[in-house]
Amino acid sequence: MELKFSCRGNVIALSFNENDTVLDAKEKLGQEIDVSPSLIKLLYKGNLSDDSHLQDVVKNESKIMCLIRQDKDIVNQAISQLKVPDYSTNTYSLKPKKPHTTPKPASIYTFNELVVLDYPHKDRALRYLERLRDDTGIKKIMDSHRWTVPLLSEMDPAEHTRHDSKTLGLNHNQGAHIELRLRTDRYDGFRDYKTVKSTLIHELTHNVHGEHDSSFWELFRQLTKEADAADLLGKPGSYVSDRASYTPQQDNDDEDQKNHRRDLLLAAAERRKQSGSKVQKE
């Protein structure tokens, strides 16, 4: 059995026997990347348990997402070295206390885990995903439709770019894992936020509809309107006859935004082509 592991921005191909378990895969992969198997987490349509046989949970030549946990000992050591300020001798001015408010509980309908590529500016990429996760419109969609996505990750542009097309996002197993292209094609920056947000709404639509048929586009437009309405409520606006009006600003100089529709259609055509080739092989 041949398997590919996407780990830290690299793809590692390894061979296994039919009776090998997920734990065997972690041990073999750990030797390749010099990481303890206990710190490795493997995802393929969800988390893979150590005692499962590979042939029962993955297909030959499957691509598996690899996540590396931080060593707890290293984290605890770093925390222990932090200096705690001594407030015992400080004098404070008396100020009225702020009213106590109970924070609103976090919604269970969200993206449980965010993963970025091991490229420069990882912190910016992570903040980008956090901004999408916490976006008012996206949160409204997730809550309204009761969607929970276990993993939202950054897509590697190098793996999904051809001379005639590029994939902006992928939805694996109807919402088990969503990938988004965050970086520009030249890796010199990040793509327009409104474009990536629209791509995320596009991929969330695939939680319900796999094909780009009329039902898909109807739901996509509905979700976009829901997100826009939620964004409007969170922004100051002008009201006429007790109704707010909000039109997203269009930037004619933004090449990503201008070509977003074209890119989505190209990505859809590519998926149909890949789907057709699989049917012919079978």
From Swiss-Prot:
The keyword Membrane does not apply. Its cofactor is Zn(2+). Zn(2+) binds at residues 202, 206, 212. The active site is at 203. Residues 99-274 form the WLM domain. It is found in: Cytoplasm; Nucleus. InterPro entries: Ubiquitin-like_dom, Ubiquitin-like_domsf, WLM_dom. Belongs to the peptidase M3 family. WSS1-like metalloprotease (WLM) subfamily. This is DNA-dependent metalloprotease WSS1 homolog 2. It comes from Schizosaccharomyces pombe (strain 972 / ATCC 24843).
